[in-house]
Amino acid sequence: MKKEEWILPYIKQNARLFVLVIFLGAVTIFSAAFLMFTSGFLISKAATRPENILLIYVPIVAVRTFGIARSVSRYVERLVGHHIILKIVSDMRVRLYNMLEPGALMLRSRFRTGDMLGILSEDIEHLQDAFLKTIFPAISALLLYAVSVIALGFFSWPFAILLALYLFVLVVLFPVVSLLVTRAKNAKLKSGRNVLYSRLTDAVMGVSDWMFSGRRHAFIDAYEKEERDWFELERKKQRFTRWRDFAAQCLVAGLILLMLFWTAGQQADGELAKTMIAAFVLVVFPLTEAFLPLSDALGEVPGYQDSIRRMNNVAPQPEASQTESGDQILDLQDVTLAFRDVTFSYDNSSQVLHNFSFTLRQGEKMALLGRSGSGKSTSLALIEGALKPDSGSVTLNGVETALLKDQIADAVAVLNQKPHLFDTSILNNIRLGNGEASDEDVRRAAKQVKLHDYIESLPDGYHTSVQETGIRFSGGERQRIALARILLQDTPIIILDEPTVGLDPITERELMETVFEVLKGKTILWITHHLAGVEAADKIVFLENGKTEMEGTHEELLAANERYRRLYHLDVPVK
């Protein structure tokens, strides 16, 4: 399935059900039309005071039949239509997730949280309206348009042609004009809604910052102003919509008068019975009800196109998903991680890494230092295979990481700033590192990270729920649970991605001592932005502006590099 196609493939996959929905929609409209037609005939016939009820028994039965048929077909149409749409939306969500997953590690660098939430919720939901409010009604209305003109042709071809031209204004001209007028308005509304979504999401996630800075009123005022501007655009669009609908209703009124004039003429010429005048006039109402929504339906097309564009944009960048044919088998014995003249940039922007190189052999510990934005997180994404360098190579035992796919998880484990803990037991959270681990294996890992005694002191022990995101535990305890998970995973390479951020100095020191103690013999890449504890590393690489600024052991740099010495003493003051 091509990534650009979010409508046609699903129509092809569900073609029979789509035909059924359109058929049921047509049956509903025609039942409503015949209901009004027979009702008009019945009223007129009853007004002639027939001598016997049997003379109007057939139209009475027809009214009842078409009334029931209209209700039943409408119900079944909605039932089948929503069944299809819910299935399609479900498939779309899975497809969108599969597009997101290969580049999941870099989503935060490509999208703001609010934008991503808008894509995952609003854009997917918006596309279901493409079927329910545009495709189904449009096809049913066009089918009705053709059948109505042909049916009227059996009575009078000149009037049928006149009616076709008249309805053409309602079926084609009005929707096209509506599309042209509302395209720009819809684009601004969609863009404004996405901005509001993003702003509000960011504000909710950073509400403490707004509160502590004392600028919450400034944010609220600015947000409310943007919201008022958005509602003003919405009012302008609604104003146009009301005038357009009023004009359409005037056209319908003209059509009713036209039908009344024609039927009166036909009756005067003896071509039509008096009892048929009301029937022909009343049938106009349900028919035009099917045509009126077309303007709104076509006016929403630009919104659907924008949703499709935004959903296609979540596809991973070529470097994030590019793989070559043929599976690469990684030897997990004595794994060596190597960066060789790696250069990388995002979307042809300035280079994040430039000719960056280092080699980390089995059992070595390396600290990768650098300020925010220096390329540390990009280096991590390259190691995990989420990105591919523009030039140079990132390899594990000579195999490029971008080709290893799921094998990366067998070679590399990451202890990051905020390890995710699921709302289940401690036992299950630790066992995520190895689904085949026994309860005893989990307890052994917990003992190694010095968490066993604390867990046993809890009322439910290892079956204690950590609650959503692990809020039951402190930052240091969450990191120890994640570390126990890594021990069960038992990978040769461990990446520490600033795991002590947000911890107090004592907890930080104790955690790092535990980390280096339990990971003895493992290859460790410690990504950090400050120098406390780096003396435990076998070598240090200082990354700045994508290039290696300093490299060596702690002792070598402390003795020979004045800048390193100054930075170290800032983080670790001389006693």
Curated annotation (Swiss-Prot):
One of its GO terms (molecular function) is ATP binding. ATP binds at G370, R371, S372, G373, S374, G375, K376, S377. One of its GO terms (cellular component) is plasma membrane. It catalyses: L-cysteine(in) + ATP + H2O = L-cysteine(out) + ADP + phosphate + H(+); glutathione(in) + ATP + H2O = glutathione(out) + ADP + phosphate + H(+). GO terms for biological process: amino acid transport; cell redox homeostasis; glutathione transmembrane transport. Its EC number is 7.4.2.-. It is a multi-pass membrane protein. The keyword Ubl conjugation does not apply. InterPro entries: AAA+_ATPase, ABC1_TM_dom, ABC1_TM_sf, ABC_CydC/D, ABC_transporter-like_ATP-bd, ABC_transporter-like_CS, P-loop_NTPase, Type_1_exporter. PROSITE patterns: ABC_TM1F, ABC_TRANSPORTER_1, ABC_TRANSPORTER_2. CDD domains: ABCC_cytochrome_bd. Residues 19-303 form the ABC transmembrane type-1 domain. It is found in: Cell membrane. Part of the ABC transporter complex CydDC that exports the reduced low-molecular-weight thiols cysteine and glutathione from the cell. Export of these thiol-containing redox-active molecules may be crucial for redox homeostasis, permitting correct assembly of various respiratory complexes and formation of correct disulfide bonds in secreted proteins. CydD contains transmembrane domains (TMD), which form a pore in the membrane, and an ATP-binding domain (NBD), which is responsible for energy generation. In CydD the ATP-binding domain (NBD) and the transmembrane domain (TMD) are fused. NCBIfam families: CydC. Belongs to the ABC transporter superfamily. Cysteine exporter (TC 3.A.1.129.1) family. This is Glutathione/L-cysteine transport system ATP-binding/permease protein CydD. It comes from Bacillus subtilis (strain 168). The lineage of its organism: Bacteria, Bacillati, Bacillota, Bacilli, Bacillales. The gene is cydD.
